[in-house]
Swiss-Prot record:
Belongs to the three-finger toxin family. Long-chain subfamily. Type II alpha-neurotoxin sub-subfamily. Keywords: Acetylcholine receptor inhibiting toxin, Disulfide bond, Ion channel impairing toxin, Neurotoxin, Postsynaptic neurotoxin, Secreted, Toxin. CDD domains: TFP_snake_toxin. Pfam families: Toxin_cobra-type. It comes from Naja melanoleuca (Forest cobra). It is found in: Secreted. Disulfide bonds join 3-20, 14-41, 26-30, 45-56, 57-62. SUPFAM superfamilies: Snake toxin-like. GO terms for cellular component: extracellular region. Binds with high affinity to muscular (alpha-1-beta-1-gamma-delta/CHRNA1-CHRNB1-CHRNG-CHRND) and neuronal (alpha-7/CHRNA7) nicotinic acetylcholine receptor (nAChR) and inhibits acetylcholine from binding to the receptor, thereby impairing neuromuscular and neuronal transmission. Ranges of nAChR inhibition are in nanomolar (competitive binding with alpha-bungarotoxin gives Ki=2.17 nM on muscle nAChR and Ki=26.9 nM on alpha-7). This is Long neurotoxin 2. InterPro entries: Snake_3FTx, Snake_toxin-like_sf, Snake_toxin_con_site, Toxin_cobra-type. GO terms for molecular function: acetylcholine receptor inhibitor activity; ion channel regulator activity; toxin activity.
Length: 71
């Protein structure tokens, strides 16, 4: 499977059986910069703390960098 990986947001080959993920959360700059984003791959969908959103998927390049709605 191929997944996008941060910080470069490049598509890389991950190990067989892995899933791609997109993890997003707010930090002190959330209002001005938007949510922080972490893209990667893992053997299983990572568990996250409250306030952190995660989406996992299992097709090539299914975790692109999310677009931010501008006012």
């Amino acid at each position: 499977i191929r997944c996008f990986i941060t910080p470069d947001v490049t598509s890389q080959i991950c190990a067989d059986g892995h899933v791609c993920y997109t993890k997003t959360w707010c930090d002190n700059f959330c209002a001005s910069r938007g949510k922080r984003v972490d893209l990667g791959c893992a053997a299983t969908c990572p568990t996250v703390k409250p306030g952190v959103n995660i989406k996992c998927c299992s097709t090539d390049n299914c975790n692109p960098f999310p677009t931010r709605n501008r006012p």
